[in-house]
Structure formats: structure tokens, C-alpha cells
């Protein structure tokens, strides 16, 4: 949108992205020899969760890139002009993000290398029940049940409950509430804050997608 509205602003953003991404890849390449091998890991492990998560993200990125560049490629080859809009991205991107968000809530609870599936399921049962109740109750409270907003509410509360569960487990056996909170480092709290932001975003998308109301009305001076 910035490129289309203001080419000079778009150039600035392009340069900024090149600097940020270029430096990130340069730092990664510089530190690559120091990264130790991950070794073997079981199917039910945090490594597997991260691997599946990254696969979905790469596929979603590729789908978005295809939808963005495909019209330009057709135009450059003289094969006609087409427009790829919101319906394509909604149909392709949303299904890929659903498993990512679902696994995002589970991943931090899974042990590295190998985890016990039964123990993991038992931990997530309360979160699943609360999320399912929220997915049913909120649409009915809004006056109409819609399946896709309900799925969004389920995933949002799935993330919220996972965060609460992690904080509760991490603060277990602490002498005071404050000591339980301070036992975690900044990186751990950063992860929780990032997950909370995604949960809030999903909740907002679900609410807008299903229950947004927009009206055009005529107003004159003095109307309130």
C-alpha cells in the first residue's frame, strides 16, 4: 500500500527492510558455526512443534508471495491483467494459520527432545474445556452463532489459557506470588507477551469478521 500511494515512502521502507533483513541474515551466517547440532528428537517434543510451526509459516509466506507476485508476472509476460484480492488471501492464509496458533499454545508446555503425550493431554484438558465454552458462549452472547468466529474465539482462549497455565506451573512452590513471577527471565516473559498479543489479535479478527456493524447515515449540524 505504501508503494502504491507514495513511491518515495515505499523506497524508504524497502531500504529499511533490506537493512534489517540483511543484517539479520548476516548475523545468522556469522554465528552459524557456533550453533551446535540439535541431535535426535521424538515426534512428541518441542523441536517437532517448532519444526511443524516453521513449515506452516513458510508455506503461508510462499502463498502470500505467490498471490502478490503472480499478477505482476502475468503482466510482465503479456498474458493479461488479473487482480488477486482479499478472497484469495482469506481462503489460503487463514487455514494455514489455524494449526500454527493451535500448536503455539501447546509448544511451550512440551519438553525438549521427548515429551509424554498422556501428560501433555492431561495438562491441556482444562484449557480445552474453557476454550470450547468460550467458543460457544461468546457467539450466542453476540446474538448469532457463526462457525468461523467461534473457531477464532476458541483459538484465542486456547492461547490465553495456555499462558495462564504456564504462569501457574512456573510459579508453583514459590514462597510468594512475586517470587514466583520473578523466577522467570525476561526472555520467558517476552514469549508470554508475544503469545498474548497473538491471542488478542485472533480475538479481534474473529469479532470483526463475524460481528462488525457498519452503517452509512446522513448527519446535519446539531446531530449527536
Predicted feature descriptions by range:
Residues 1-224:
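Contiguous transmembrane helix-bundle modules in multi-pass membrane proteins
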Amino acid at each position: 500500500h505504501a508503494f502504491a500511494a507514495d513511491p518515495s515512502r515505499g523506497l524508504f521502507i524497502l531500504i529499511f527492510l533490506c537493512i534489517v533483513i540483511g543484517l539479520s541474515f548476516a548475523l545468522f551466517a556469522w554465528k552459524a558455526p557456533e550453533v551446535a547440532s540439535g541431535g535426535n528428537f521424538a515426534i512428541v517434543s518441542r523441536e517437532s512443534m517448532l519444526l511443524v510451526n516453521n513449515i506452516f509459516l513458510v508455506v503461508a509466506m510462499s502463498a502470500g508471495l505467490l498471490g502478490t507476485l503472480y499478477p505482476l508476472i502475468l503482466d510482465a509476460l503479456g498474458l493479461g491483467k488479473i487482480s488477486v484480492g482479499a478472497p484469495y488471501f482469506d481462503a489460503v492464509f487463514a487455514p494455514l494459520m489455524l494449526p500454527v496458533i493451535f500448536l503455539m499454545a501447546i509448544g511451550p508446555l512440551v519438553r525438549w527432545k521427548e515429551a509424554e503425550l498422556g501428560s501433555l493431554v492431561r495438562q491441556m484438558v482444562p484449557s480445552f474445556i474453557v476454550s470450547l465454552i468460550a467458543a460457544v458462549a461468546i457467539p450466542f452472547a453476540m446474538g448469532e452463532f457463526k462457525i468461523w468466529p467461534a473457531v477464532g474465539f476458541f483459538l484465542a482462549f486456547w492461547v490465553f489459557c495456555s499462558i495462564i497455565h504456564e504462569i501457574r506451573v512456573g510459579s508453583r512452590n514459590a514462597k510468594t506470588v512475586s517470587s514466583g513471577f520473578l523466577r522467570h527471565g525476561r526472555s520467558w516473559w517476552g514469549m508470554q507477551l508475544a503469545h498474548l498479543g497473538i491471542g488478542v489479535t485472533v480475538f479481534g479478527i474473529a469479532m470483526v469478521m463475524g460481528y462488525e456493524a457498519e452503517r452509512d447515515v446522513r448527519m446535519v449540524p446539531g446531530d449527536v
